[in-house]
Amino acid sequence: ITYTDCTESGQDLCLCEGSNVCGKGNKCILGSNGEENQCVTGEGTPKPQSHNDGDFEEIPEEYLQ
């Protein structure tokens, strides 16, 4: 399954290495090998839902507090 760099929630929370999320005001840059993603300053850009249900990974509730 390939995940996009942002979640579909529109909350500017991006999936980064180790399932960590970038906080508001940050965006995720995908590493070339898919393992060295970095959170950097900048607004995230949520991608539209595609035809594949698994394109987006749910954010664990512990990150949404």
UniProtKB/Swiss-Prot annotation:
It comes from the Eukaryota. One of its GO terms (molecular function) is serine-type endopeptidase inhibitor activity. It is found in: Secreted. Its main location: secreted. Residues 55-65 are annotated as: Interaction with fibrinogen-binding exosite of thrombin. The keyword Glycoprotein applies. InterPro entries: Hirudin (IPR024793), Hirudin/antistatin (IPR011061), Prot_inh_hirudin (IPR000429). Keywords: Disulfide bond, Glycoprotein, Protease inhibitor, Secreted, Serine protease inhibitor, Sulfation. Residues 39-65 are annotated as: Disordered. Pfam families: Hirudin. GO terms for cellular component: extracellular region. The modification Sulfotyrosine is found at Y63. Residues 55-65 have a biased composition (Acidic residues). Residues 1-3 are annotated as: Interaction with thrombin active site. Glycans are attached at T45. Disulfide bonds join C6-C14, C16-C28, C22-C39. Belongs to the protease inhibitor I14 (hirudin) family. Hirudin is a potent thrombin-specific protease inhibitor. It forms a stable non-covalent complex with alpha-thrombin, thereby abolishing its ability to cleave fibrinogen. This is Hirudin-2. It comes from Hirudo medicinalis.
